[in-house]
């Protein structure tokens, strides 16, 4: 008797959107098609077309394709330029609260969901959402698990409140690459202490969602706990 697929809300990376992230995770959907149903949403903020960004040059080459005309972001670290750099220290950001509201709306309109998956800036947002759930600040959040691919701690000062509360007890799988030039491995490792019992899937590649057959068992063993 086959188990009912777990519904997972998927949060894309900076300069992506729900449709482009769905295309980029085709291998993962194929790998886990009997276990999960992935549902994709887009961030509320359109990213201005900018020729060069400090972290955007590498990130664009790694994660943005021709199909990403409608580039989106969950928040901006540079308020005036409306741009984002994961390595940029800043006191305040722009757009995070609207993005949290967008996730809440998706839960009401598209839910329920068993878990949540995020990539890059989306994974950083997932960590914040999990912190809000742990602190019981958002009654709409009831994620049973989280998968964070190329996640990181936000360098924005006003976001440190998400990491200063109680340790997050939501079961989590943290996936990151040894050759990631956009979000280096150490940035993803810095996020691990925020989660209790964080599980790690380390792959030899770069800035993408890995879905090789060698990764199947790790994903399946993690998800099996919730079916």
Curated annotation (Swiss-Prot):
Taxonomic superkingdom: Eukaryota
Question: Which residues does the Swiss-Prot or TrEMBL record annotate as the active site?
Answer: 120, 180, 207
Q: Which reaction does it catalyse?
A: a carboxylic ester + H2O = an alcohol + a carboxylate + H(+)
Q: Which GO molecular function terms does the record list?
A: hydrolase activity
Keywords associated with the record: Hydrolase, Serine esterase
The catalytic activity of this protein is classed by the Enzyme Commission as 3.1.1.1
Please name the InterPro entries in this protein's record. AB_hydrolase_fold, FSH-like_dom, LovG
- Cellular component aspect of the GO annotation: cytoplasm; nucleus
**Pfam families, alphabetized:** FSH1
User: Which Cys residues form disulphide pairs?
Assistant: none
What does the sequence similarity comment in the record state about its family?
Answer: Belongs to the LovG family.
Q: What does this protein do?
A: Exhibits ester hydrolase activity with a strong preference for long-chain alkyl ester substrates and high selectivity against a variety of short, branched, and substituted esters. Is able to hydrolyze ester bonds within a wide range of p-nitrophenyl derivatives (C2-C14) in vitro, with a strong preference toward substrates of >8 carbons.
Q: What is this protein called?
A: Esterase OVCA2
Q: Mind giving the lineage of the organism this protein is from?
A: Eukaryota, Metazoa, Chordata, Craniata, Vertebrata
């Amino acid at each position: 008797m086959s188990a009912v697929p777990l519904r997972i809300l998927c949060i894309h990376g900076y300069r992506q959107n729900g449709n482009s992230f769905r295309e980029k995770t085709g291998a993962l959907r194929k790998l886990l098609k009997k276990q999960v149903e992935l549902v994709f949403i887009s961030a509320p903020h359109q990213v201005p077309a900018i020729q060069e960004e400090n972290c955007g040059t590498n990130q664009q080459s790694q994660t943005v394709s021709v199909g990403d005309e409608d580039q989106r972001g969950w928040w901006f670290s540079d308020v005036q330029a409306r741009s984002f750099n994961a390595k940029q220290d800043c006191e305040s950001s722009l757009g995070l609260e609207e993005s949290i509201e967008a996730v809440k709306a998706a839960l009401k309109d598209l839910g329920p969901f068993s878990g949540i998956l995020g990539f890059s800036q989306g994974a950083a947002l997932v960590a914040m959402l999990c912190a809000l759930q742990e602190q019981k600040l958002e009654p709409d959040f009831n994620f049973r698990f989280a998968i964070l691919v190329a996640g990181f701690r936000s360098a924005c000062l006003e976001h440190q409140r998400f990491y200063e509360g109680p340790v997050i007890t939501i079961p989590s799988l943290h996936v990151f690459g040894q050759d990631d030039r956009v979000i280096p491995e150490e940035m993803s490792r810095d996020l691990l202490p925020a989660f209790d019992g964080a599980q790690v899937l380390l792959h030899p590649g770069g800035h993408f969602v890995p879905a090789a057959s060698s990764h199947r068992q790790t994903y399946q063993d993690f998800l099996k706990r919730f079916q």
